[in-house]
A protein has these predicted regions:
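Conserved catalytic core of sirtuin-type NAD+-dependent deacylases
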Residues: 1-242
């Protein structure tokens, strides 16, 4: 059997990156790095104070460039030696790419990029940043004359990569969920697009609650330990010819 004939699709969330020391999620108190989410992660917040928003993401971006992929990221990337692997991530970091994953769909944008505030998804106005130019001076303009804004899907904005994510999920031979509680929509709805009979593996140290019936196996561990169990124990059992 051609080992690349099987398609593994992973949906990853904040718990995937926490072992790398990078936190890109809001707490139960509605704060993100001590800032109210409404101020730094909404279109209204951007319109009201683009300087604050630019400086907030400068801070996060500098933390990102100090972070390193963890064993969980690396194990997912290594599976590409034997399978087609797609990562659909709710995270705005680029740690999957740093670990070597080649097919990554970012649902909520990418912290390492900035874009036009007038035409955010025009590729001509999207700029990739590096550790040496991670800080954007507030007021810097894109090539179309609008302010550069973080290439982030703010709360309340449409998720443009969702259709692609649904189509990829519908092709899965295995669907893995790592580090997300499945209560962030629309991403949480992806589990409903998994073909009938396809195994669903959820890696999360907390007990899961999902309305999908049957076919779900939980590995109640963190991302790295859970991925190790998936690779060493579950995958050989599920795809023994691979």
């Amino acid at each position: 059997m051609n080992t690349k004939s099987k398609h593994l699709v992973f949906l990853t969330g904040a718990g995937m990156s926490v072992e790398s020391g990078f936190k890109t999620f809001r707490g139960a108190d509605g704060l993100w790095e001590n800032y109210p989410v409404a101020q730094v992660a909404t279109h209204e917040g951007w319109e009201a104070n683009p300087t604050l928003v630019t400086e907030f993401y400068n801070m996060l971006r500098q933390k990102l460039f100090d972070a390193q992929p963890n064993e969980g990221h690396r194990l997912i990337a290594q599976l590409e030696e034997r399978f087609r692997v797609t990562v659909i991530t709710q995270n705005v970091d680029n740690l999957h790419e740093c670990a070597g994953s080649s097919e990554v769909v970012h649902l909520h944008g990418e912290l390492s990029k900035v874009c036009s505030s007038r035409d955010p998804y025009n590729p001509h106005f999207i700029r990739q940043l590096t550790a040496t130019d991670a800080v954007i001076t507030p007021g810097t303009k894109a090539e179309d004359g609008s302010l550069l804004r973080p290439f982030i899907v703010f709360f309340g904005e449409a998720v443009p990569m969702m259709d692609a994510a649904m189509a990829l999920t519908a092709q899965a031979d295995l669907f893995g969920v790592i580090g997300t509680s499945l209560n962030v929509y629309p991403a949480a709805g992806l589990i409903n697009f998994v073909p009938r009979g396809v195994p669903i593996i959820i890696i999360d140290p907390e007990p899961i609650s999902t309305t999908v019936n049957g076919g779900i196996t939980q590995i109640q561990k963190g991302a790295s330990e859970g991925m190790k169990e998936l690779v060493e124990t579950l995958l050989p059992r599920l795809f023994h010819n691979n």
